[in-house]
């Protein structure tokens, strides 16, 4: 039985759960065959959130959570295989991003940590695993992020149209795809993470569905200006940012305490929009088509606000290009696993700032 398929697993900084996809790369164009979503239990979500900040006993907690994550990832793989009718021997590899708890590429000895006990995941699934995709790029002087632009280029580059692909997960980032074939990409700022945290705290809902709650508030312009004064927003690319920078803990340092929660939610949405729009207007020149993917793609109020900020440009979802916006990032890590197994570099130095193209990831054989 030929192992023709790849599985991609992504659990992003929003900490909502696990996206798993089954992909076929044998066709002329990559094909997303099936998908499966497994939400995180609330207790696991809170434990992972706590690991974003230094605390006593964090090494032990990180190791045990890595084991828990491997079991949840294996459960997601099992659900995906049952849904698709594919057997484990038909899968060449699992590309598992892991759960980011620290990302510090600018440190003297830069590092990044994505939790997952990969050997345990191999044992539980019987499938070869590729993980730790970011460390090699950082070792080569890069930011280790974003890594998805190489896949965006393979899927969406068009010699006749200047496109930008915007991923709005916990953090927002973009890939610039000019007509001349050069590619850049970088983090823009916050995505859904702070909005989700604020929404959960004040409404009890995990996220603000379609941005309806934010739409009831008004933007607090003074607060927005203070948040946008963070030096990160003025940094030129390549740049990347970690989840712990954009948190409600950071936000609370700017609040007076008498703000309407709905107004703060509206302001956080505009902060995400402003971060993205500034990057596109400042660094993506004459781009005419903007396509959004990630969880934020389903926030219709956010998309409408982004369209307003980028008037004169087409703003849509990657769905219209043939790839479901919800699954694109997991799809990318299936592709990155294949790149490594085939001995093909997975980074783009002009995106991450690395010294050159590098093979990304570590292979754990079955």
Swiss-Prot record:
Give binding positions for ATP. 12-19
EC number annotated for this UniProt entry: 2.7.1.170
List each coiled-coil range. Answer: none
A single GO molecular-function term is: kinase activity
User: What domain of life does the UniProt record list for this protein's source?
Assistant: Bacteria
Q: Which reaction does it catalyse?
A: 1,6-anhydro-N-acetyl-beta-muramate + ATP + H2O = N-acetyl-D-muramate 6-phosphate + ADP + H(+)
UniProt keyword terms in alphabetical order:
ATP-binding, Carbohydrate metabolism, Kinase, Nucleotide-binding, Transferase
- Kind of enzyme, top EC level? transferase
- Copy the pathway line from the protein's UniProt record: Amino-sugar metabolism; 1,6-anhydro-N-acetylmuramate degradation; Cell wall biogenesis; peptidoglycan recycling
Annotated GO biological process? 1,6-anhydro-N-acetyl-beta-muramic acid catabolic process; amino sugar metabolic process; peptidoglycan turnover
Q: Which family does it belong to?
A: Belongs to the anhydro-N-acetylmuramic acid kinase family.
Write down the PANTHER family for this protein, in alphabetical order.
ANHYDRO-N-ACETYLMURAMIC ACID KINASE
Per the entry, what this protein does is: Catalyzes the specific phosphorylation of 1,6-anhydro-N-acetylmuramic acid (anhMurNAc) with the simultaneous cleavage of the 1,6-anhydro ring, generating MurNAc-6-P. Is required for the utilization of anhMurNAc either imported from the medium or derived from its own cell wall murein, and thus plays a role in cell wall recycling.
Q: What is the official name of this protein in its record?
A: Anhydro-N-acetylmuramic acid kinase
């Amino acid at each position: 039985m030929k192992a023709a398929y790849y599985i991609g697993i992504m659990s992003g900084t929003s900490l909502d759960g696990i996206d798993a996809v089954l992909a076929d790369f044998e066709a002329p164009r990559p094909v997303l065959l099936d998908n499966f979503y497994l939400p995180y239990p609330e207790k696991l979500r809170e434990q992972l959130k706590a690991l974003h900040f230094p605390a006593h006993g964090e090494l032990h907690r990180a190791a045990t959570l890595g084991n828990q994550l491997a079991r949840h990832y294996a459960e997601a793989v099992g659900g995906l295989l049952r849904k698709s009718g594919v057997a484990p021997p038909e899968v060449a590899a699992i590309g598992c991003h892991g759960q980011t708890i620290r990302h510090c590429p600018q440190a003297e000895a830069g590092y990044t940590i994505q939790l997952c006990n990969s050997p345990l995941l191999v044992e539980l699934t019987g499938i070869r695993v590729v993980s730790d995709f970011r460390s090699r790029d950082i070792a080569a002087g890069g930011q280790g992020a974003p890594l998805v632009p190489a896949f965006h280029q393979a899927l969406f580059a068009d010699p006749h149209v200047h496109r930008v692909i915007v991923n709005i997960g916990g953090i927002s980032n973009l890939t610039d795809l000019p007509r001349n074939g050069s590619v850049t990409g970088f983090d823009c700022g916050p995505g859904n993470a702070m909005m989700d945290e604020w929404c959960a705290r004040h409404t009890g809902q995990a996220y603000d569905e379609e941005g309806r709650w934010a739409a009831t508030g008004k933007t607090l312009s003074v607060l927005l200006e203070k948040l946008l004064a963070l030096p990160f927003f003025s940094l030129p690319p390549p740049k990347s940012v970690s989840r712990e920078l954009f948190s409600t803990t950071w936000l609370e340092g700017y609040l007076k305490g008498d703000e309407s929660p709905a107004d703060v939610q509206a302001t956080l949405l505009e902060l995400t929009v402003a971060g993205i729009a500034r990057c596109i207007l400042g660094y993506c020149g004459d781009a005419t088509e903007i396509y959004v993917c990630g969880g934020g793609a389903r926030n219709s109020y956010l998309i409408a606000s982004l369209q307003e900020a980028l008037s004169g440009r087409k703003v849509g979802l990657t769905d219209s290009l043939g790839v479901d916006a919800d699954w694109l990032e997991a799809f990318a890590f299936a592709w990155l696993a294949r790149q490594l197994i085939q001995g093909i570099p997975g980074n783009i130095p002009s995106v991450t700032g690395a010294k050159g193209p590098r093979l990304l990831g570590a292979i754990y054989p079955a």
